[in-house]
Amino acid sequence: MSDPMDTSIADQSFDWKKAVWTLKTSPKTKLFVWKALHGAIPAGEALRARQINVDGKCKRCNLPETIDHLFFHCPFAKQVWTSAPVFPSIEYNGSIVLRNQWINLISRKNLPPTGVEGQLAPWILWGIWTARNNLVFNDKLTSAAETLSKAIYLAREWGTCQTISSPLPAVPPTLA
């Protein structure tokens, strides 16, 4: 496994605030993205590199489960990303490395009628991760369409909750 600090993410010019901490997404999703960008997600090959005796292969396609494979190179992940309602669309021209493509992914515009105000990429990563965990731990296969729909739903729901105005001030009842 390569050292996450050997990539452009370690560059002093990388804007962590813009790339992670100011994303319009839930705090747990921000932390998840931060961990993914640092190579700290417990995917199969990462666990094996830590001497944990697990099968390091992807449960969907049986290839080595690296973070980049899990989120981009697995046929399941490719299907999720290519179906994502963003502009410009995600194209696969060679190898995609999460740490090198993150700013590009969060810069994409959501197409209507998603109703998502912020970036969709963090929610898609989270959706792929939870679909993977459902397969690994619950033996439940989730389709790419279901994964993408859930990511859009969660992004929209979280955004709606953030824009709900504060409740009206309480007015004591009048005494007659």
Predicted segment positions?
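Primary recognition of RNase H-like, Mg2+-dependent phosphodiesterase/nuclease domains
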Residues: 1-176
